Each structure stands twice: as structure tokens, then as C-alpha cells.
């Protein structure tokens, strides 16, 4: 049981170190993006999947209501 706890603690600490390194790298990338075009691309990447997901949910319902073939 003790070896299992040691292994889990080791994985936890390695994971937190990995996450902190990734966060620092992401922050460095965000600092480099100063141009408005690159910011707009980031916003488009965030919202396009959201819009596509909503459309995928509502299009069958709208089609069913229009054609009345449910």
C-alpha cells in the first residue's frame, strides 16, 4: 500500500509540473500574439466549433418541423 501511495504521489507531482510548464508556454505564446489578426483567428477557432455544435443539434429539429416527417 505504501508503494502505491508513493507512486501516486510521484505521478501527481510530475503531472502538476507538466501542467505548470504547459501553462508557462501558453502564456509565452499569448504574449507573442500582439497583432489583431492573430487574436481574431483565436476567437474564430473558439466560436466556430460552438456554432457548429449548436447547428448540429437544432437543424434536425427545424427540418422535422418544416417537413413534418419526424
Swiss-Prot record:
Disulfide bonds: 64-70
Major localisation: secreted
Subcellular location: Secreted
Protein family per UniProt: Belongs to the frog skin active peptide (FSAP) family. Brevinin subfamily.
Keywords: Amphibian defense peptide, Antibiotic, Antimicrobial, Cleavage on pair of basic residues, Disulfide bond, Secreted, Signal
Propeptide: 23-44
Function text: Antimicrobial peptide.
Cited InterPro entries: Antimicrobial_frog_1, Frog_antimicrobial_propeptide
Organism: Odorrana versabilis (Chinese bamboo leaf odorous frog)
Protein known as: Brevinin-1Vb
UniProt feature coiled coil, ranges: none
Amino acid at each position: 500500500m505504501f508503494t502505491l501511495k508513493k507512486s501516486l504521489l510521484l505521478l501527481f507531482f510530475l503531472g502538476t509540473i507538466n501542467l505548470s510548464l504547459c501553462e508557462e508556454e501558453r502564456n509565452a505564446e499569448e504574449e507573442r500574439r500582439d497583432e489583431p489578426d492573430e487574436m481574431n483567428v483565436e476567437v474564430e477557432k473558439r466560436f466556430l466549433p460552438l456554432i457548429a455544435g449548436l447547428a448540429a443539434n437544432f437543424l434536425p429539429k427545424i427540418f422535422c418541423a418544416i417537413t413534418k416527417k419526424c
